Amino acid sequence: MKSLLDLFKQFTPDEHFDAIKIGMASPEKIRSWSFGEVKKPETINYRTFKPERDGLFCAKIFGPIKDYECLCGKYKRLKHRGVICEKCGVEVTQTKVRRERMGHIDLAAPCAHIWFLKSLPSRLGLVLDMTLRDIERVLYFEAYVITDPGMTPLKKFGIMSEDDYDAKRKEYGDEFVAKMGAEGIKDLLEGIELDSEIERLRGDLTGSEVKVKKNSKRLKVLEAFRKSGIKPEWMVLDVLPVLPPDLRPLVPLDGGRFATSDLNDLYRRVINRNSRLRRLLELKAPEIIARNEKRMLQEAVDSLLDNGRRGKAMTGANKRALKSLADMIKGKSGRFRQNLLGKRVDYSGRSVIVVGPTLKLHQCGLPKLMALELFKPFIFSRLEAMGIATTIKAAKKEVESGTPVVWDILEEVIKEHPVMLNRAPTLHRLGIQAFEPILIEGKAIQLHPLVCAAFNADFDGDQMAVHVPLSVEAQMEARTLMLASNNVLFPASGEPSIVPSQDVVLGLYYTTRDRINGKGEGLIFSDIGEVQRALDANEVELTAKVAVRITEYTKDKETGEFTPSTSLVDTTVGRALLSEILPKGLPFSNINKALKKKEISKLINVSFRKCGLKETVVFADKLLQNGFRLATKAGISIAIDDMLVPAEKHGIIERSAKEVKEIEQQYVSGLVTSGERYNKVVDIWGKAGDEVSKVMMAKLSKQKVIDRHGKEVEQESFNSIYMMADSGARGSAAQIRQVAGMRGLMAKPDGSIIETPITANFREGLNVLEYFISTHGARKGLADTALKTANSGYLTRRLVDVTQDLVVTEQDCGTHGGYLMRAIVEGGEVIESLRDRILGRSAADDVLHPENRSVLLKAGEMFDEDNIEELEAQGVDEVKVRTALTCETRFGICATCYGRDLGRGGLINIGEAVGVIAAQSIGEPGTQLTMRTFHIGGAASRAAVASSVEAKSNGVIGFNATMRYVTNSKNELVVIARSGEIVIHDEHGRERERHKVPYGAILAVKADQQIKAGHVLANWDPLTRPIITEFAGKTQFENVEEGLTVAKQVDEVTGLSTLVVIDPKRRGAAKVVRPQVKLIDASGAEVKIPGTDHSVTIGFPIGALVQIRDGQDVGPGEVLARIPVEGQKTRDITGGLPRVAELFEARSPKDKGMLAEMTGTVSFGKETKGKIRLQITDPEGTVWEDLVPKEKNILVHEGQVVNKGESVVDGPADPQDILRLLGSEELARYIVDEVQDVYRLQGVKINDKHIEVIVRQMLRRVVVDNIGETGYISGEQVERSEMLNTNDALRAEGKIPATFTNLLLGITKASLSTDSFISAASFQETTRVLTEAAIMGKRDELRGLKENVIVGRLIPAGTGMAYHQARKAKDQMDEAERRAIAESEAAELAGSTSDVSTTADASEGAASE
């Protein structure tokens, strides 16, 4: 009976695998898969539609067409299962075996596999050590290869043409063997002795760099073959597998035509050519005919495997290239991305969304018809359970008739059953959220207004999809993790995502504004109820200032009890009434101000931190309801008259026009260049526009009123347009400026500014020319948006791919590493405070009190709102925090290093996929970034050139570590450091501001000086760069000869003459000599640099104006020459999305600057053609030198001391240089700061830790330097975690570990070089990745998320992580049980009849493990 039941059992594959291995199939393996040889190219008989025997669809080989029925119809039904029909030879079984049974074709001549030949670098070429060209000539029968030279002087692997071959045959007879075609290559491959070849190469890893590189590449491939046990000759095919027929279907269409998969065509060609070749060989046809046929067979096989890879692609009847096996798996519509990573979903529906203002945050309105369809199976099962319907069919009828009982059941089924709503594009995890459905009439889904921000949805026709989680586990996850009321913070920044916008904000803002001399001003109320009654009786107005007695509750931190306190508060009627909805424990002061959008956001944030999630959600809902109600009550509307155009506008425009005329005049008289004229004109109009908008805002924002005492006073305006902009409901000052000020300057599509401004505004209306000018830039904007979306999506895809395997795997890795964090200060302004940067991170070391060194926070504890306030009060200004980059967890990251989960507000949970979260957080705002490259000029150069810097706050002066200065004869301090900074600390020693001071600046302050705000710190000449001497002495010119290296220039205005160094290209004879100056001391000897025997030599660069005479006495700090700065070319700054992509791809910038390779003294060597030789000598006397093009701006001069990593040639830094010279911490800081700059410009908040997570993934590979006793090859790239594990194992055995250096890879490179071949193949360059993996016989450990999605397992993150851990534990337990049982059986066999309870104990012990 059991065996009978087995017949009906569903076949379930055993899913417990932990890794997937890829390799190359041997001919034996291919034959073992096969169920028969395909001999004929026929497919199916066009009359009977039955497959031809031995053809491509043969039933004998591949299985029956109908379930349990042979082809000729002799055996039908289940009882014959497994019988093989003697007439037609078909096995009686299910037809689905046609999806898994393979066939094979025996090739009459071997054929090389094109992937191993043409996928670069060519694997065949590496193994044989031949060039790709030579191999191709052999394979396609253009040349012979010598496979066995015998006793002749010929070389094995030698190539000879047809004529050579004939000549050599005459000469040597049959002494040597040479072949052409894949046979020759196969013989060579079989002749390779892997072991001896590897030994030879390992010994040969010396010599020139090219040779070493080539040898190590070959070595790697050969080692891979040896390690994986794959024979090289398998790269040449003797037998070709045939795909199961149902995977390359042939479907008859009406009218006798067939739709077929291209593969059938390709296979047909191979079979045709193969059988023709076989026949030719049997007939012993002339060599040349057979050769041609072999070549055609090789080409047919190539096309089948990868069409178009070599030569022209094979085409079908309609001139379209046929889709080969390789095309099936690669690209967006290939197997990986189309079917494995994204699948279609059942139980889903989509419809238009409309607003649901009465819903609670965790609800959505679901149309009844949609719900009925989605929950059908649940309804059927209820109907059967209740006995209303006996069968599914009856239940179906019942539902379709729509009886009332069905609707009752639907209500019941839907209760407590969350559904998921998704709006495309899903850019971050808040794009899918779960809601409890509420049944509604109509056909549109109702959405809660507060979740619109997270979905980026609006109600102008957006559609959303609904998905039903079916299993209990899925429902549970949807409810606990995805319910909208559990996702109130953005994972990117930790800010609330449920912030009201638009009309709600306007309503709340209007209610909380105060009006001078409003109705009922000055009244005093005993409680809020009284205020409400007075308002209802129309005794007071909403915005009147009144005093009210209000009771506040403060929560005790330890006990959680509330203590009330009551006081009289000056407020307004609206605010007092609004205070009723405040959650218990929030002070009234939070709401006692005009509530703008930012304030409301802060309010919700404070509520979340102080009162918890539940209270906050309820509070947000109440805010929403009140906002809608109050906006309606306020009745704010706008009219043309609200757009007040300032009277002064006309005057400002006239004045600017006059200035422009003057400049035109100057240009005509030749006083200014055309570029200067353009810049100045743009400047004037830019200023005019700003001025008009200032005047306009001043007019809009204030209004005059009479107060209670009859005086005229100003108050904030109640102008509707102003209120909308001020509250943050809609519009901004810039938009109002276009409506009521002047539109100002417009840009051309290339980003340059048109110098004719639009002086009109929208209220006045534009004339034709103005309209035309404005269309120019506007159209560019539309085109940009389309590009931007695609680019941003691609960036997100690359980011997700590089981080997808990063998951929190342990609680604490125990490292003490970390980065010092301090506030970001730029140009004296705090851009990001220390508080914002360390909030939600963990301390790396104990945080000490700055004065008495007591411990304020222990290492490993997290900074939260409360203890940060404590730190700020104590004056802590820098903190060492744990970061994702210093985390020492292998294959993952630890919770302590990551810190707070921004989307939830607590410490991150183990199993959270922080990599994907980081990628989404950076990619999601991508569409808001600009696409354009900013041209310096016009708008950008408007910032006037700074010539001094002043303090913005009181404090004490300090300098940074690299600051150096000398005192000159006038007793002024002259800066001689390249990267000097002045730092101002307050009385607690906290850094308040930090200012860069250029080389040659004169300091107006000393260290530790007390200063007041507004004090000038330093000043300098912005138009020239000085060259300054650090030593005293008498000048002695060298090579300064007029007409040769310098020219005399006479100033037209002053009549003074100066010497200017001329360009060597314009000089005659003295191309090589450098004009320079030496210093002579009193005794006539050359002044030396202290501590060395270098004499002080200062070179004058091209274009320098020499400020001294020969033989003049100079003191330290004196200016020897000045270089006009004007010479710097304006370069375009890449901004927006392209900049972010550039940083994450770790590309070297176009004209990159140069950093000092080591600490030492600068000198210039002999110049070569067009290049300057820059040398740095360190204290030990080691010299490093490099050639710098003359047009580059060198920031250092002869004799200057530079620190390692300091900038010596102007230009953007190369991330690779930063990593090499300054280490990974500096690199991380550079990338984080640069990326943040781009986002900050657009007002997007992203937490630093997301960028750090990406940088960690960019640094996850290392390069092996010294191999120690590992099996690596020098120069090989290895996963960092694997390297560390290997080294730990070696240390434990007392062997020599390998040394390595960090490697920075761009995100695309990093994704492709991941250890998981499945993930890399599904990302890009599928062919290359799979070829490499197959040769190496790679194992994919299925660590990342992507691999697991592709093979269809639960992902090892979140709840899946627990599942996998439990599964592994169970496997180990089973193993232990099996061992115990085996042992007990062995013991019994040994004749001992010991108590069986011991085995039970053993298995229990294993279980308790």
From Swiss-Prot:
Positions with a binding annotation for Zn(2+) 1: C70, C72, C85, C88
SUPFAM superfamilies listed in its UniProt record: beta and beta-prime subunits of DNA dependent RNA-polymerase
Record's catalysed reaction(s): RNA(n) + a ribonucleoside 5'-triphosphate = RNA(n+1) + diphosphate
Any Pfam family hit: RNA_pol_Rpb1_5
GO molecular function, one term: DNA-directed RNA polymerase activity
This protein's GO CC annotations: DNA-directed RNA polymerase complex
Source organism, top-level taxon: Bacteria
Record region (Disordered): 1385-1409
Functional note: DNA-dependent RNA polymerase catalyzes the transcription of DNA into RNA using the four ribonucleoside triphosphates as substrates.
Subunit architecture: The RNAP catalytic core consists of 2 alpha, 1 beta, 1 beta' and 1 omega subunit. When a sigma factor is associated with the core the holoenzyme is formed, which can initiate transcription.
Name used for this protein in its record: DNA-directed RNA polymerase subunit beta'
Organism of provenance: Variovorax paradoxus (strain S110)
Classification of source organism: Bacteria, Pseudomonadati, Pseudomonadota, Betaproteobacteria, Burkholderiales
